Structures are given as C-alpha cells and as structure tokens.
Regions:
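Conserved C-terminal helix/tail region of periplasmic/extracytoplasmic solute-binding proteins
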Residues: 385-486
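Bacterial signal peptide processing site
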Residues: 32-35
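Short glycine- and hydrophobic/aromatic-rich loop-to-beta-strand nucleating segment
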Residues: 148-149, 290-293, 297-298
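N-terminal low-complexity, Pro/Thr-rich disordered segments
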Residues: 39-49
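Secondary-structure end/capping motifs
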Residues: 299-417
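Short, glycine-/small- and polar/acidic-enriched structural segments
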Residues: 47-238, 250-285
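Bacterial N-terminal signal peptides that target proteins for export
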Residues: 2-20
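C-terminal motif of bacterial Sec signal peptides marking the signal peptidase cleavage site
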Residues: 27-30
Length: 486
C-alpha cells in the first residue's frame, strides 16, 4: 500500500510564478532596470532567459507517473522539483511502486499515465512475454548505474583468484571466472548458488547473465513450459525487489545480486557484501531505464507526450550539466523519503562520480550514472535490439527470428521521432543546444566491442551476434523438456 506521504503532487502554479519572474527580469533589463553581471553561456536546462510557455492543445494536464525507489528515477524527481513539468502546464503526481510487475500492470490498466521502466519491459510486453500490451518509449532515462554484489563469504573465496595492483587492491574489472571455482565448490557441497536480480526482463538479469557467462558460469535457460530461467544453470537466478536485496543477502537466502543504486552501496555501508563489478565495466555506457507509456496514450495524447518528453530532457540536462555540478543537490533530493529514501551518503557514493567496492576502496567512476551526455536520452533501436537478443539468447524468445524482426520490433517500441520533435522544440525555444542531439542518426549506434568479453555487437546483425557468444542459444536452437534442441 502506498501512503499519501509517499506521493508527490505537482501543481503548475510554481511554473507560472517562475515564468512571471523571468518575464519581469526581461522587462527590467529592457528598461535599464537592475541586472546582474554574469558571463553569457549556451542555453541550459536550469538557467535560461527564455520564457517557457506551455504548448497549446495539451490533451491531458493531470498525470500520474510511477517509479521504483532507485537513483536512476532522478529525471522524474528533477523534472518535478525544478518545475520542468510545471513549465509545460502539467499537473504531475509521482508515486513509488512496490515492484516492477505492479508498475507495469498499472501503466497497462491506465492507473499510471507512464512510468520509470526497465528497458526490457516495453519490449517484452509488446512481444507478449508476460503481460501482453503495446508499450512505447520516447525517452531513455540513463546509462549505466548498476552493480553486482556478493556476500562477504563469497568475496573471501573469490579474492585469491583476482589479480592485485601494486597497492594490494584488487584489479578491476573482475571477471566472473574468479567466481566460477566458488560456484563449483558450493555445488560439490550440495548447496545451490542463488543470486538475485530484480525482474526477468530487467537489465540486471541480462547483465548478471552476461557477466556470469563471460566467466564460464551458465546462468540457465527459460522455456515456454519453465519460466524459472534455471534450466541447466550453474548459478540460480531469482527475482528480489531492489530495496530488499541487502536484507536478502544478509539473511543468506542469496549469495549475490545485481541491482541499481543505492542498493550495492548499502551493502558496503552495512558491511554485509562487496560490489565486485559495475555494469559500466560489463558493457560501457549501456542503456538502463526508459520512460514507458502505452502506445494508446501516445496516440491519443501527442501534445502531452511531447510536453512530458521536453520536461524529462531538461531534467536530464540539469543532472549532467557543468560536469555534474548539480549532483550534490540531486543527492539531497533523492534521499528524501518520497523518492529513494536512502541515506544521502549512500546515494552520493555512486551518484557523484565515485564508486566504493570494498569498504574504503572508493574509486573514481565519473560515468557510473549518465543522464544526458553521450546521447543518453535518445531511444536507439540498437539498444532495443540488444535486449531482444538477450531474450532470445536465454530462451525468453523461444523461436528463431530473422534480423528484420528485431529491427521491426525495435521500431514498434522505441520512438525517436517523438524524442527529436521534443528536442527540436526545446532548441527553438532557446532551452537546449542543437549540437547536443543526434539529428542524423538512423537509430543504430556504431559497432562496439566495449563488453567485458570483448565480443563485438552490431545491432543490425543480431543473429550473427548470438552465434558469436560462447554460452547461450544459437540461431536454430530452442529449449524443450529441459534440453536444448537443434
């Protein structure tokens, strides 16, 4: 049950007052009245002389958005706190949700207008894996932001298998090959090696699987008649809601997990576990969350959808501008109970350009959370195809699909057309710099091998990519009765 105190209400009145203040400042300057001497700069999300006038024809102005208590919900919190929703004439209510399934179901049922979603959720829903519904995304919320944590006991067993730097600290990135002997030891003792991830179609599931497989540990297959994801598995992965990860680890129910922040850093602060790798080290600048809405909502409310996307773009710009200068304020906002509700020091440990592995081993990781730079907010088709490829790799997509299917599905869900229309309007209004957006892209990023195993990924050739991966289903394979069939 979500209490009223956990719900954040937004009113356009603040935006009206802000707009009035901006207008007054402009009039004073034009009339030779008081002004402040300040260096000129390119338009930014948080400081602009442009007067924001809500778009005409908003189909809906009262909206409710859902989120899970993770730091990467930040664009929603900032769009609210900085009045960017209000600038668009939108009354927004933000509501934390109990888990990812509840969040998705409430978007589908129309109880939520949209939500902070796992990147795989709109894709899985659209192809009918789990609840069937056509969900689209006009906005990618962030890059990176996750980590994999193991218990202290497991870490002590892994540590001899990890090379050290001259100062004695472990060398990163840490391969899952260091974990493999530990998993084998547990198996020999008759103990299943249980690990947690947040949802079957979560980034965390696919990142954890990718890391394990790259180190020779089989994370298991799915099949139409067995959705546990544990067929032929060396490590048994199961769902645990993000805020419950540390407690579940401490209880010994799981030996490790993959989750977003602040729940890896929480394990460090509590002294119950050690984050061994970040997803930045698994796949550099990987897409993480998206903002999801139903296709019906986007079709029936195009002006409102554009206005929401504008507000979220401005929030992302604010989060990354001036070399993350606003992150300390963002941490203070996110620490509030109505948002993430974790200790500010815990959130700051990853949100402000550092990441702590073992207690005291804090390292510079400036791109652990990226919200705008590197075109983080653009919904790339190639990102969608990667998630679909992982669904196929592990059997969630049970049958072979040709490359054209992957492309068509990506285009059905990812909506860069909406994103670019919103971005262009911000540029036209003097609120954004045209150079910050990828106008000429076809939606596919260049081929990259920035993965922990060095395997190259070309979003235009998903089947060739699947064939190149050592562990996982190949193009012609399927899973039935617990066996891989050619």
């Amino acid at each position: 049950m979500i209490s009223y105190s956990d719900t954040i209400l937004s009113s356009p009145q603040r935006g009206v007052f802000a707009g009035s203040a901006a207008l007054l400042a402009c009039l004073l300057a034009a009339c030779g009245g008081p002004s402040t001497d300040a260096p000129s700069s390119s338009p930014s999300s948080s400081e602009s002389t442009a007067l924001v006038i809500p778009m005409e024809g908003l189909e809906k102005t009262e909206l409710t958005f859902g989120f899970i208590k993770l730091t990467d919900m930040a664009p929603l919190a900032i769009a609210y706190e900085k009045g960017f929703f209000e600038d668009e004439g939108l009354y927004v209510t933000l509501e934390p949700q109990a888990n990812w399934k509840v969040l998705l179901d409430r978007v589908i049922d129309g109880e939520l207008s949209g939500a902070h979603m796992l990147a795989g959720q709109p894709l899985a829903a659209t192809i009918g894996y789990g609840t069937k519904a056509h969900i689209v995304t006009p906005f990618s919320m962030d890059l990176n932001g996750n980590g994999i944590t193991v218990s202290n006991e497991v870490w002590e067993k892994m540590r001899p298998n990890i090379p050290s730097m001259e100062d004695g600290r472990p060398m990163h990135p840490i391969s899952a090959s260091a974990l493999k002997p530990v998993v084998e030891e547990y198996a020999a003792d008759g103990k299943p090696f249980n690990m947690g991830m947040v949802f079957p179609v979560s980034t965390h599931n696919y990142e954890l699987r990718y890391w394990l497989a790259s180190g020779g540990i089989h994370p298991g297959f799915y099949s139409p008649d067995d959705v546990s994801g544990q067929i032929q598995a060396d490590a048994l992965l199961s769902v645990t809601p993000p805020p419950q990860m540390p407690a579940t680890l401490e209880a010994g129910t799981i030996y490790g997990y993959c989750v977003g922040e602040p729940w890896n850093q929480q394990a460090v602060f509590k002294g119950i576990g050690v984050p061994v790798i970040t997803d930045y080290e698994i796949w550099k600048d990987n897409p993480e969350k998206v903002f999801g809405i139903t296709a019906e909502f986007a079709e029936e409310n195009p002006v409102t959808t554009k206005a929401v996307t504008r507000a979220l773009i401005r929030a992302a710009m604010w989060l990354d501008e001036n070399d993350n200068a606003n992150r300390a304020e963002a941490v203070e906002i996110l620490a509030r109970s109505e948002y993430v509700g974790a200790d500010a020091d815990v959130i700051a440990n990853s949100m402000t350009g550092t990441f702590e592995y073992e207690r005291g081993d804090k390292r510079e990781v400036p791109d652990f959370n990226v919200f705008f730079r590197y075109n983080a907010t653009y919904p790339y088709y190639s990102d969608a195809v990667w998630y679909l490829s992982q669904m196929r790799r592990w059997g969630q997509i049970s049958d072979s699909k040709d490359d054209a299917w992957y492309d068509a599905t990506a285009r059905e869900v990812y909506r860069p057309d909406i994103y670019l229309e919103a971005a262009q309007s911000l540029v036209d209004d003097g609120l954004a710099d045209a150079a910050d957006f990828p106008w000429e892209t076809d939606g596919y990023k260049p081929v990259t091998s920035d993965f922990i195993d060095g395997v190259s990924y070309d979003g235009r050739q998903p089947n060739a990519y699947l064939e190149s991966l050592t562990i996982g289903l190949k193009t012609s394979q399927t899973v039935a009765a617990g066996e891989v069939i050619e």
